[in-house]
Structures are given as structure tokens and as C-alpha cells.
């Protein structure tokens, strides 16, 4: 496989990257406040790419919005961006919600130490 060729694998076969050791103050705070996502409807998030560069082929667009998509069992991946606004340093959590037709899903991101 050449480095620019995409290799698609089943969405349930992608294992997330291990969490790297936090180095900066922002990274340490992000780990301390580790976001959790609670979904009341729709599909659970799946990791998008693994450490070999193999990409999640996505979910089928047919069937119920929350059917057969309750997570891979390997865990998920989230990107947390921190931006210092005044002295507060809030963070924004991003995630991809697949197989949803609604603009606003029922996911709630919360933070708390674990």
C-alpha cells in the first residue's frame, strides 16, 4: 500500500489511539476534565482512523438512526481544543455523529475528573 492510498476498514474494527502523555498545562487540564459524551438517541461515535492510517469506512445510511451502532467496544476518539479567553480557558469538544438526519443530536458533553 502506498502512503497516499486510502485503506478502508469496517467501522467497528478501528481501534482508537492510546491517550498520549499530557505535556503542556492545557493538555493536563484537558485530561483532568476528560469530557464524557452521553447520548439519548442516535449512533455512538466510532474512531475514524487507526495508527496504521486505515480509515473507518462509515456506517450504512439505511436502517434506524440508532440501529446497530452502539459503539465498537474499543472506545472512541475526541478532539479537545483549548482556547484562552480572558482568564477562564474554556474548552470545546468536537465529535462526529454519523447516521443522523437531525441538525442537533441528543449528545451532551460533560466534564469531570475520572
UniProtKB/Swiss-Prot annotation:
What triggers production of this protein? Expression is strongly induced during the first 24 hours of host infection. Levels increase from the time point on when germ tubes enter the leaf and the maximum expression level is reached during the formation of first haustoria. Thereafter, expression decreases during branching of hyphae.
Secreted among the record's keywords? yes
Q: Which organism is it from?
A: Plasmopara viticola (Downy mildew of grapevine)
Q: Which InterPro entries match?
A: NPP1
A Gene Ontology term for the protein's cellular component = host cell cytoplasm
PANTHER family per the UniProt record, alphabetical: DOMAIN PROTEIN, PUTATIVE (AFU_ORTHOLOGUE AFUA_5G00600)-RELATED
Protein location: Secreted; Host cytoplasm
Summarizing the function annotation, the protein's role is:
Probable secreted effector that may act as a pathogen-associated molecular pattern (PAMP) recognized by the plant immune system. Seems not to induce necrosis, neither in several susceptible or resistant Vitis species nor in the dicot model plant Nicotiana benthamiana.
| Gene behind the chain | NLP1
Similarity-based family: Belongs to the Necrosis inducing protein (NPP1) family.
- Name-wise, this protein is NLP effector protein 1
This protein's UniProt keywords: Host cytoplasm, Secreted, Virulence
Does the entry feature the keyword Methyltransferase, yes or no?
no
Q: Anything noted about its domains?
A: The structure of NLP effectors is remarkably conserved with a high level of conservation of a central region containing the conserved undecapeptide motif AIMYAWYFPKD and heptapeptide motif GHRHDWE.
Task: Give the superkingdom in one word.
Answer: Eukaryota
